[in-house]
C-alpha cells in the first residue's frame, strides 16, 4: 500500500507552460538601494523566511510534468488492457484457421513470364518465343546462331 501512496501526485489548479527548456524573456528589475528603516528590514526578513518555508512545500516543475506523464500513461495502459481483451475475444470467435495447418488454398497466379512458359511445357521449352524473330532472321543470315539459343536450326 505504501508503494501505491508514493505514486500519488497532487496537481495544482493552474499549470503553466514552462518547461525545462524554456527561457525567461525578462529579467527581474533590480530594486534601487535605499536606506531602509529597521521595520522595513524586519518585514523583508520575515518575507524571506516565509518564502523559504513555502519552498519546502512547493513541488518543482519537472516533478509535476513527470507526474502528469505518468497519469497519462496509466490511462493509456488501462484502455489498452480493455481493448486487447475485446480484440482477443473477437479473434478467437472469428478465426477458425490456425497458422501451420494445411488449407485448401489454390495457386492462381505466377510471377514472371506468362506467355509461353508454363509448367506443362517443362523446363527449357518455350524459350524460342522469347527471342524476337528479327534477331533470329539476322542471326540466320550471318550464320552465327548460338546452338544453345535455337537448337532446331
Swiss-Prot record:
Keyword Disulfide bond included in the entry's annotation: no
Gene Ontology annotations for the cellular component aspect, listed alphabetically: apical plasma membrane; plasma membrane
UniProt xrefs under InterPro entries: CRIB_dom, CRIB_dom_sf, RIC2/4
Topology class, membrane: Peripheral membrane protein
Expression (tissue specificity): Expressed in roots, leaves, stems, flowers, siliques and pollen.
PROSITE patterns: CRIB
CDD domains (alphabetical): CRIB (cd00132)
CRIB domain span: 99-112
Domain of life: Eukaryota
Keywords annotated in UniProt: Cell membrane, Developmental protein, Growth regulation, Membrane
Record note on disruption phenotype: Increased rate of seed germination.
Gene3D superfamilies, A to Z: CRIB domain
Induction: By the root-colonizing endophytic fungus P.indica.
GO biological process, one term: cellulose microfibril organization
Quaternary assembly: Interacts with ARAC4/ROP2 and ARAC11/ROP1.
Name by which UniProt lists this protein: CRIB domain-containing protein RIC4
UniProt source species: Arabidopsis thaliana
GN (gene name): RIC4
